[in-house]
Curated annotation (Swiss-Prot):
One of its GO terms (cellular component) is plasma membrane. It is found in: Cell inner membrane. InterPro entries: ATP_synth_b/b'su_bac/chlpt. GO terms for molecular function: proton-transporting ATP synthase activity, rotational mechanism. The chain crosses the membrane at residues 9-29. It is a single-pass membrane protein. F(1)F(0) ATP synthase produces ATP from ADP in the presence of a proton or sodium gradient. F-type ATPases consist of two structural domains, F(1) containing the extramembraneous catalytic core and F(0) containing the membrane proton channel, linked together by a central stalk and a peripheral stalk. During catalysis, ATP synthesis in the catalytic domain of F(1) is coupled via a rotary mechanism of the central stalk subunits to proton translocation. Pfam families: ATP-synt_B. This is ATP synthase subunit b. The keyword Kinase does not apply.
Length: 202
């Protein structure tokens, strides 16, 4: 759709064409009327030539005005297209910058999350390491405690056996003395046997 100035120019051109047509028609009509009273063909040709020249000049001016209006219209349309292209380019640039900011923010957020996950994994790994070390120490202490208890139990068992054997020998020695049949050799034999058994339970 044309602008108000384009419509005004077109209307002016139409009026100019109408004026030219009316002027030419009037000239031809007057020439035909005068032809009945005048016989000077040279004057008629001269007048007709001037009228044709005037018409040619007016037609040239009219053509120039029309061409100028078309060029102006084309330039206006070109300017509108350029302005629209510039606006679209600016909008595209703004949209691209917005996307860049969004992606930059997302990338920064993802980097922070990755760093946080890495820190959490390192902390969990260190905690798991400490837990395993603590469990290993507890197991070693438990084994050592069980070994100590087992050794103490064996010592107590050996002591009990030694005490029982010592009691048995004492009873046997007492019985022999009571019987009056023990001699020095038998006494030494009993003592040596007792000492050997004591050495075995150490």
């Amino acid at each position: 759709m044309g602008t108000p100035s384009d419509r005004t120019t077109t209307l002016s051109l139409c009026l100019a064409v109408c004026v030219v047509v009316i002027a030419v028609g009037t000239g031809w009509a007057s020439e035909a009327g005068e032809g009945a009273h005048q016989v000077d063909s040279a004057a008629q040709m001269k007048d007709f030539g001037w009228r044709v020249l005037n018409f040619a000049v007016l037609a040239a001016l009219l053509g120039w005005a029309i061409a100028k209006a078309q060029v102006k219209k084309a330039l206006n349309e070109r300017q509108v297209k350029i302005e629209r292209s510039l606006r679209e380019a600016e909008q595209s640039r703004d949209a691209a910058e917005q996307k860049l900011r969004e992606y930059s923010g997302k990338l920064e957020h993802a980097s922070r999350e990755i760093e946080e996950m890495r820190g959490a994994m390192l902390r969990e790994s260190e905690q798991e390491k400490q837990r395993i070390i603590a469990e290993a120490r507890a197991a070693a202490e438990k084994i050592a405690g069980q070994a100590t208890l087992s050794a103490e139990h064996e010592v107590l068992k050996a002591r009990s056996a030694l005490q029982a054997e010592a009691g048995r020998l004492a009873v046997q020695l007492a019985a022999t003395k009571l019987a009056g049949a023990i001699g020095k050799e038998d006494h030494d034999l009993y003592v040596d046997d007792y000492l050997k058994k004591v050495e075995q339970f150490k």
